[in-house]
From Swiss-Prot:
Its cofactor is Zn(2+). GO terms for molecular function: alanine-tRNA ligase activity; aminoacyl-tRNA deacylase activity; ATP binding; tRNA binding; zinc ion binding. Signal peptide: none annotated. This is Alanine--tRNA ligase. Binds 1 zinc ion per subunit. Zn(2+) binds at H586, H590, C690, H694. Its EC number is 6.1.1.7. Pfam families: tRNA-synt_2c (PF01411), tRNA_SAD (PF07973). It comes from Korarchaeum cryptofilum (strain OPF8).
Amino acid sequence: MQGIEVEFLRSRGYVRKRCPKCGEYFWTLKDRETCGEAPCEPYTFIGRGRQNKSLEEVREDFLRFFERRGHTRINRYPVIARWREDLFLTSASIVDFQPFITAGIVPPPANPLTISQPCIRLKDIDKVGPTMGRHLSIFEMMAHHAFNTKDKFVYWIDRTVELFHEYATSVLGIPEEEITYKEGIWEGGGNAGPDLEPIAGGLEIATLVFMQYRIENGSYVPMDTRVVDTGYGLERITWFLRGDPTGFHAVYGALLHEFMDKLGVSEPDLSLLSEYSKVSSILRELEKGRSISSLRREAALLIGVSEEELEEKIAPLEAVFSLLDHTKALSFMIADGLVPSNVNEGYLGRLLIRRSLRILNQLGSEVPLSELAVRQAEYWSSKGFPELREAIDRIAEIVSIEEERYKEAVERGAKIISDLMREKGRLSVDDLIMLYDSHGLSPDIVRRIAGDVDVPDNFFEMIAARHEARKPEPPKVFERMDELRRYPPTKLLYYQDPYLLEFEARVLGYVDGKMILDRTAFYPEGGGQPSDIGSFEWRGIEVKVVGAEKHGGWILHSVEGDLPPAGEVVRARVDSWRRLNRMRHHTATHVILEAARRVLGSHVWQWGAQKGDEESRLDITHYKGISQEELRRIEMLANEVVMRNIPVRTLWLVRTDAERRYGFTLYQGGVVPDPVLRVVEIEGFNAQACGGTHVLRTGEIGPIKIWRARKIQDGVIRLEFSAGVPAVKRIIDYHQKIKDIAQSAGISEEEIDTFFRGMMEELKELRKERRRMMKEAEERSIERALEAYESTGRHKLSIVRLESIGIDEGIKLADKLSSDRRIVLLTKESGDRVELALLATNYGEGEVDAGSLLRELSREMGGGGGGNWKLGKGSVPKDRLDEFMGVLRKRLEGI
């Protein structure tokens, strides 16, 4: 890819040079030797405020500038990239238009257009804070895009640069001699092209990409559509204009100081902060693998303070910066439908949450993370994003739940880490990644338990890089497509009339032993809906059709029995009971999904579905279990929709038109890789891109009964249901069971509720009495064990094996029953391990340290533990308990 020749810049007197520091080519108007970008040159804009504008004002100035120059303003897309098979998060404005618009397959929503797109990018997450605002995990990419096709030329390189130049000089007020244009190559989302990066004051404030290639097998292939792909950093431009000490001061303003007060962090002297921020450009070297400690040392030398003083004053503020950024990102992600989990975009949300909790822990703050995330939603809802206000309750609940889950992970972590340490001796980076990926244990927790562990400065970036993109499932390739192409595509009668169950068709031929017809009403397997079955009849012969499958534009029919010859006309019958049941269940799936979204919240998304004849299932994303009351409301709403007998329409729409009309909830069933979408709309209630067969009105579904809601994996709930006649049959069976139970109990059906409540109360009392008796028996057992002590040196040692009560209850009893100086070891089997408690009863401090003794000995045995001088708690593998007790006796003899 060659350099860029820009006639506009030549005409303004710019010349092309090569930077002696970074080796990159750039365009400059004056006698400049370097490219002007940090770290080749330091930041010069800090302390030189040009305009005291807010983020909202800068955004509006930009959009209005381009509107006045023929661009159509369009609304932002979600930060969760539901329309992409290869990405989880919207990381740039061009992501909104890839791959179909950039490939010229579908038209853009406007051409040219302008947008300010919130983006989430986690590849630099460990640099957020230390680089003072240069790196952010959430930012707004202001952009203007033009899509040049063979039929329509909009503008290209010169006009793009001219538009930036005019905006920079007339709106931002930057003298043109202060602007340099640095050349580069951009790649992203499967596309590439040369770019220019305008630099001013040491800061890159935009990227102008001339996308003209698609990347295939590592090679650049020219595109039919040439795309102007620009990105103007809203936060960077605001920082540049205001000249504030850091980008966080410019972006967050009063909210920054509010967070500092909440978190107990004082702002350092602003002159020190400004000087550090100016030289913080050297932290770009983090990208080359240098450690933050070595760069901090260099920065301290440059501004004339000690490394210790700089660390003490700057590090807490950097932590506040990180929390500001992360909680804003979380509020947008959750508002746009993210549910934290261990997979996909949910994993990335959880990564942000756990990194934030780690930072709060380092600060020693007890402020709930949920409080900070909610405050961000409140703040930004009044700054151009009113949709965040509707999500405040959900943000608070989700983050609170995740905080509790993190605490649980930490509590479980000691054993996991101890086991791994025993196996490996010293933990590697791969071990740290595994502990985080599989168990949610951050390096800080690992270090707390395992001691000295080498943690890379970019640990969370390494984690994010593994999960930020996904490889789409490769389409199943039918190996005999060349044979199929010899025949005309199959006419799909099931789309013309889903109730067509009998038809005539001509046999065109066979591929792979499967029949090709000129037309068919047999629905092929796809989208969670099984294929139709039925029969073919010709010349008095009848054979079974046991399946149908679609490859490209052709339907192949699997037939059992004699095969009619090519050219024969067959009479086909689709199994009506199966077809109609599947139609009802498929439309019911759409109804239940929308009902769940309306009851539980807009974060609910279809994870998977399977439509059956008697029973179907729908898997949805949700951050906690579904209560019986919520399930009842979902079921009631679904049946109300059935009773309203709403029309179900099928439309074929160009992708961009469908997205404009219905939004991205179209893709509940997954991304549909087609330029024209088949949209199934339950009028005024729900619309989805869907290729399945459906009823024409919701009343045809019949009753909907949801039988079960259960968690099948982290963040996913499975709803199992029946519709129509199968639902009625299940209800009848259910009622019969109630009758049978009532008859067995000798009561009426109406008395069942009262009868079983009484039984449960009685059972509760019996269990309570049983626990009391077991406790008394255990107390007597402990008393006997304490009487039968053994002497170990100058100590009395009593060993108590607990049977029916837990270790904590045993500690209370042992402490109460010990009347003299006694070392008491309590053991309680738990799976393949034994829980331990070591008590030094009636000892004075400094005589025996039970906590230290238990911790030391249990670690030697592959366990772990700790405590204070009076009490230690821990565990060891069951097969090493006797060894533990033997070593304990020897140690006590020496104390």
